[in-house]
Curated annotation (Swiss-Prot):
Protein name according to UniProt: Matrix metallopeptidase-21
Encoding gene (name): mmp21
Native source organism of the sequence: Danio rerio (Zebrafish)
Hemopexin repeat placement: 356-415, 417-473, 474-522, 529-585
Annotated GO MF terms: metalloendopeptidase activity; zinc ion binding
Keywords, ordered alphabetically: Calcium, Disulfide bond, Glycoprotein, Hydrolase, Metal-binding, Metalloprotease, Protease, Repeat, Signal, Zinc
UniProt region (Disordered), positions on chain: 141-170
Composition-biased stretches (Polar residues): 143-159
Length: 599
């Protein structure tokens, strides 16, 4: 009998020991079979649940709007969706409500509006999408009401002729909504719009208990840094990863989870549909059942694109039903080079304002390039510099290059890391020389090899004193530019202008002169007078711009003066704001300067 018992024990022990599951693949591909799959939308019942979940069907007597605006002590991070009980008015009313909601969904999804649950509608509902409820205002818009969305849809998506309008800052601080400071966040699934952070530097953290099981921690953090940087490049917001402050002091917390996760009131539904959701002014959660991938991966869901979308929600943006918008609710596969488009930029700037700031130097860099066919062409690009950073401005697109700013020492080899005071390109039939000025010194730049010259033609080393080679001029300068029309360099210092004749290598006989004399104001009293930040001859506009602070003055062109001969030579037109002419030249936090998109 004892022997039999021992045999049974051995068999049971063997069964227990061999029940351990073995994983063989380093890429965890053998785990995918255990991932929970989201419920498919297959019939009118599942379609009705979908429409209810995302706000197309409202529960009878629902008190959602009152809850979302409450100033009481409800803990929104822990509460369930609460609805006041009510009575139904019968199946016919329910059917009509379903058809109406279905038609709304079809309109917003650019489907034929039939009110019928057809295959196209089914496919649209089964697409991966954000878990944030669709904005009430968006749903009202489909019935024809006047709103912001109508403005967005009718506005042109080309950027060339846009004049920036003053931002409408409709802000309400959450301290007025929630008494408990640790609960100062809102669920964007009940987004009501026109609310924003009241500060411009925001802290974020990928929480330790919320790492993804599919990507390395380094990959996750790189993607989130890049996603935050993309919003920073188009708004006055700056983001910094904070690993040390108490968690309640972190503005935006990110994490991955499945099903019931991270103490959240919402459940994830598994792979295949809802990939993430966000809480206004607070948290972003990603469904770790989804197959998230790094940029430049052909399959799966781009974590970068999803992160940019969800950060948009946290910052205050609702879903936007417009082709090209990063805020569309459904995931649309895009190429690896997707960016935040013009209208999404304007949407975030309506909440936070536009980027402003003074520049130390602005110039067009001209150089010769050889085409693949062996032809030599002359090209130029516009650059803005300040505080040791530079932006390349794409005039044809009216925006900065994606991924800017960049540190000066990275892109302009050999220049002072803090930037420069002035740029001059002497370009005529006999001379093609680029100079940068800083303090009392100047450097000559080799545009062909993209670095400063180490030696002058006479063998002396660069940098050299400005006064040595530009007699009558000494640093530090405010700014300078070369005017091809009269072959003079215009040096600006205080209220004076020094005109330097490059052919004769000396100052013009009338120099120095007062800036108000050389560049008279067309509108009386409208003049920078002294201490310019930058003077810049633009080959795009074929004229000179003078910049000071947040303002600029355009110098009357020769063509304009020929049409209106009564106007003074070099007259300054009425000032305008820099951000009205050159859009989205925005700073990023110093910690994200090296975060660039990998190719």
């Amino acid at each position: 009998m004892l022997t039999v018992i021992r045999r049974i024990f051995i068999i049971q022990t063997f069964i227990f020991i061999t029940a351990e599951k073995i994983f063989h693949s380093r890429d965890h591909s053998d785990v995918l079979n255990n991932i929970h799959q989201a419920e498919l939308i297959t019939d009118t019942d599942t379609a009705q649940r979908f429409l209810s979940k995302y706000g197309f069907i409202k529960a009878a007597g629902s008190e959602e709007s009152q809850l979302s605006e409450s100033s009481g002590d409800l803990d929104f991070s822990l509460s369930l969706d609460l609805h006041e009980g009510g009575t139904t008015s019968g199946s016919s009313s329910s059917d009509l409500q379903f058809v109406s909601a279905l038609r709304d969904f079809q309109r917003l999804s650019d489907l034929p509006v039939t009110g019928v649950f057809d295959d196209a509608t089914k496919a649209a509902m089964n697409k991966p999408r954000c878990g944030v409820m669709d904005d009430d205002q968006e749903l009202k818009d489909v019935t024809g009401s006047n709103s912001t969305r109508n403005h967005i849809r009718t506005s042109t998506n080309t950027s060339h002729n846009h004049e920036h309008q003053a931002p409408v800052r409709k802000k309400r601080h959450l301290s007025a909504l929630l008494k408990n400071t640790s609960l100062q966040k809102r669920d964007v699934s009940k987004w009501t719009g026109h609310m924003a952070f009241s500060k411009s530097v925001l802290k974020w953290r990928l929480i330790g208990e919320g790492y993804s099981s599919q990507l390395s921690i380094q990959e996750q953090k790189y993607i989130f840094r890049l996603a935050f940087r993309m919003w920073s490049e188009i708004s006055p917001l700056q983001f910094i990863e904070d690993l040390h402050s108490p968690l309640e002091n972190i503005d935006i917390r990110l994490g991955f989870g499945t099903g019931r996760h991270l103490g959240c009131s919402q459940r994830f539904d598994g792979a295949g549909r809802e990939f993430a959701h966000a809480w206004f002014l607070g948290d972003i959660h990603f469904d770790d059942d989804e197959h998230f991938t790094v940029p430049n991966t052909g399959s799966g869901i781009s974590l970068l694109k999803v992160a940019v979308h969800e950060i948009g929600h946290v910052l205050g943006l609702p879903h936007i039903y417009r082709p090209g918008s990063i805020m569309q609710p459904s995931y649309l596969p895009q190429d690896a080079g997707f960016e935040i488009d013009w209208m999404d930029r304007k949407s975030i700037q309506r909440l936070y304002g536009v980027c402003t700031g003074r520049f130390s130097t602005v110039f067009d860099w001209i150089r010769k390039e050889q085409t693949p066919y062996g032809e030599v062409v002359v090209r130029f690009n516009t650059y803005f510099m300040r505080d040791g950073l530079y932006w390349l401005y794409e005039n044809r697109n009216n925006r900065t290059r994606y991924g800017d700013p960049v540190a000066v020492q990275v892109g302009w080899h050999g220049l002072p890391s803090g930037g420069v005071d002035a740029y001059v390109h002497v370009w005529n039939r006999k001379t093609d020389a680029v100079y940068f000025f800083k303090g009392m010194q100047y450097w000559r730049y080799d545009s062909e090899n993209d670095h400063v010259f180490s030696h002058a033609p006479d063998g002396r080393l660069y940098p050299r004193l400005i006064s040595e080679d530009f007699p009558g001029v000494s640093g530090p300068l405010d700014t300078a530019y070369y005017d091809r029309r009269d072959a003079h360099i215009y040096f600006f210092k205080g209220s004076q202008v020094f005109r330097f004749d490059v052919r004769m290598r000396r100052l013009a006989s009338s120099s120095p002169q007062e800036m108000t004399e050389v560049f008279p104001a067309i509108v009386s009293g409208d003049h920078p007078v002294r201490s310019l930040d930058a003077a810049y001859f633009s080959y795009t506009h074929n004229t000179v711009f003078l910049l000071k602070g947040s303002l600029f003055w355009r110098v009357l062109s020769g063509k304009e003066r020929r049409r209106r001969a009564f106007l003074p030579m070099n007259g300054l037109l009425a000032h305008r704001r820099v951000h009205e002419q050159w859009f989205d030249i925005c700073d990023v936090h110093s910690s994200s300067l090296r975060t660039t998109r990998r190719r």
